[in-house]
A protein has these predicted regions:
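Thiamine diphosphate
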Residues: 1-141, 145-147, 166-173, 182
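Conformationally flexible catalytic loops at phosphate/diphosphate-handling active centers
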Residues: 157-187
Length: 187
């Protein structure tokens, strides 16, 4: 691996997903999840790989687009804030039944204390309800490392994986060692 660079949770998620081999990211804007998609859109590695990025009509269509990519065996990332889980609930819960082929990670950015939202909500309940694995990283390094694990787990279990972060975590920074193939060291 390379020398550690200073990364936010946002950057660790984006780099982790890119290095895990995603083919596309599908999102509906909402702080702080918007920044993940923006980072991927600007990433030289993502551009070189022709990684698809789409701002969707809503979170449900983002989930459906990611599932479509998964059904042909490719990996996808879905990004939304916590209230978006309400919008994509139908597609999210049913994806536990239909399953996935390529790995799908659903990133939900919860906002305890309503820093930039109209309500508080814990997205983990959707994962518990749908019997979908839930990952909640506690550091930037864990976040980066967990992305590869999340995609492997998704493909092994043939179900999406829910990853939860919070607004305040999203903007904190710490040293992260990225894969040797990764050329982006700081963000």
């Amino acid at each position: 691996s390379q020398a550690p660079g200073l990364h936010s949770f946002i950057c660790a998620i984006a780099l982790g997903a890119i290095h895990a081999g995603i083919s596309g990211v599908y999102a509906y804007p909402g702080t702080p999840s918007t920044e993940i998609t923006e980072y991927i859109q600007e990433s030289p590695i993502a551009k070189a790989r022709g990684l698809h990025s789409s701002w969707c009509t809503n979170e449900k269509t983002a989930m459906e687009a990611a599932l479509g990519v998964s059904y042909v065996g490719k990996r996808a990332l879905v990004c939304m804030k916590h209230v978006g889980m309400n919008v994509c609930a139908d597609a999210f819960v049913n994806s536990a039944i239909t399953g996935v082929n390529g790995g799908v990670v659903v990133l939900a950015a919860d906002d305890p204390t309503m820093h930039s939202s109209q309500n508080e909500q814990d997205s983990r309940f959707y994962g518990k309800f749908a019997l979908i694995p839930i990952l909640e990283p506690s550091s930037q390094q864990e976040t980066y490392d967990m992305m590869a694990y999340a995609y492997d787990l998704s493909e092994q279990m043939r179900t999406p994986v829910l990853m939860r972060i919070t607004t305040r975590m999203a903007h904190s920074r710490a040293a992260v060692e990225v894969a040797a193939s990764g050329k982006e060291v700081t963000c």
